[in-house]
Curated annotation (Swiss-Prot):
Involved in the cellular defense against the biological effects of O6-methylguanine (O6-MeG) and O4-methylthymine (O4-MeT) in DNA. Repairs the methylated nucleobase in DNA by stoichiometrically transferring the methyl group to a cysteine residue in the enzyme. This is a suicide reaction: the enzyme is irreversibly inactivated. The methylated ADA protein acts as a positive regulator of its own synthesis, as well as that of other proteins. The transcription-activating function of the ADA protein resides in its N-terminus. It activates the transcription of alkA, alkB and aidB. It comes from Salmonella typhimurium (strain LT2 / SGSC1412 / ATCC 700720). Its EC number is 2.1.1.63. Residues 94-183 form the HTH araC/xylS-type domain. This is Regulatory protein ada.
Length: 353
């Protein structure tokens, strides 16, 4: 049977185990054996789950007879807000065109580099370096879309030199800067239409690897979806070598665990890729809610953005967005239809038993 969405106490416990700083201010947890209550991010040794209680705020814990932890000071809301303000300041500095080092950032917000790095990742779900790279890539895409010369766009985006761009930006653009500026012209996408256990399927491959796995009911609809995803690319039928890789893909998606060793061309924003990595960590036979998935990446308030990232997935089954359900366990919001989502989850649940 498909697992039901976890209760709120279980979600709180997951955040406490992860020392999730983004949960600070949303609830506190208390330990019966010590009589102390703490923030979710407190670095103190974790108690056994059976000895832990959760409260919506510090006042409720105080009313229940617990005393505040001297280490994390959960009753000091202003201290928590000051920490969040420092992270917000660090984000703004990282978003500037001029690159900044972790040491400079730490000095600017009056924190140690180690503490800043840990708190930044816990609050945003990304490292300071990852945040800076994401904004750098965003500026590059915007500059290229406006038609700026490639070299000027590279430096305007904040890359210190061309070699830094060629090492990193291509992972985000998914193609060369020249091709990106032309809307994907001259990018070749091979494709094949084939059968799989639940109907028809289109498998597409770019020069970098498998870039789309699209289940569907009709070939015409699948081809239309391919053209929507890659409107300016050259769409070429499969050759013999690609047909062999397609058979590997079909063999993988026809099995419960969907283990695929072929290279993948995963194109998306830094946030989308973060969500997709979290999706791949969901064990086969289990489900999570959109709220849990948002909490997993350290952004519990970004539920809508997480759902949008799931919907942007182009690699069906390989990136298992079908394993995300509503908080009450109901199925909804699957790009390729709720009926197909139910089929996939039923198959995984049956073989789990």
């Amino acid at each position: 049977m498909m697992k039901k969405a976890l209760l709120i106490d279980d979600e709180c416990w997951l955040r406490v185990q992860a020392r999730d700083a983004s949960a600070d201010g949303r609830f506190v947890f208390a330990v019966r054996t010590t009589g102390v209550f703490c923030r979710p991010s407190c670095r103190s040794k974790r108690a056994l789950r059976k000895n832990v209680r959760f409260f919506a705020n510090a006042q409720q814990a105080l009313d229940a007879g617990f005393r505040p932890c001297k280490r994390c000071q959960p009753d000091n809301a202003r201290a928590q807000q000051r920490r969040l303000d420092k992270i917000a300041c660090a984000c703004r500095l990282l978003e500037q065109e001029t690159p900044v080092t972790l040491a400079f950032l730490a000095q600017a917000v009056a924190m140690s580099p180690f503490h800043l790095h840990r708190l930044f990742k816990a609050s945003t779900g990304m490292t300071p370096k990852g945040w800076q790279q994401a904004w750098r890539a965003r500026r590059l895409r915007e500059a290229l879309a406006k038609g700026e010369p490639i070299t000027a766009a590279i430096y305007r985006a904040g890359f210190p030199d061309s070699s830094s761009y060629y090492r990193h930006a291509d992972q985000t653009l998914g193609m060369t800067a020249k091709q990106f500026r032309k809307g994907g012209d001259n990018v070749s996408v091979r494709y094949a239409l084939t059968d799989w256990v639940y109907g028809r399927c289109l498998v597409a491959e770019s020069e970098r690897g498998i870039c789309a796995i699209l289940p569907g009911d009709s070939d015409d609809a699948l081809l239309a979806e391919l053209h929507t995803l890659f409107p300016s690319a050259r769409h070429e039928p499969a050759d013999a070598l690609f047909q062999q890789r397609v058979r590997q893909v079909v063999a993988a998606i026809n099995t419960r665990d969907v283990l695929l060793s072929l290279p993948l061309d995963i194109q998306g924003t830094a946030f989308q890729q973060q969500v997709w990595q979290a999706l791949c960590a969901i064990p086969c036979g289990e489900t999570v809610s959109y709220q849990q998935l948002a909490a997993t990446i350290g952004k519990p308030t970004a539920v809508r953005a997480v759902a949008s990232a799931c919907g942007a997935n182009k690699l069906a089954m390989v990136i298992p967005c079908h394993r995300v359900v509503r908080r009450d366990g109901a199925l909804s919001g699957y790009r390729w239809g709720v009926r197909r989502k139910a089929q996939l989850l039923k198959r995984e649940a049956q073989k789990e038993e």
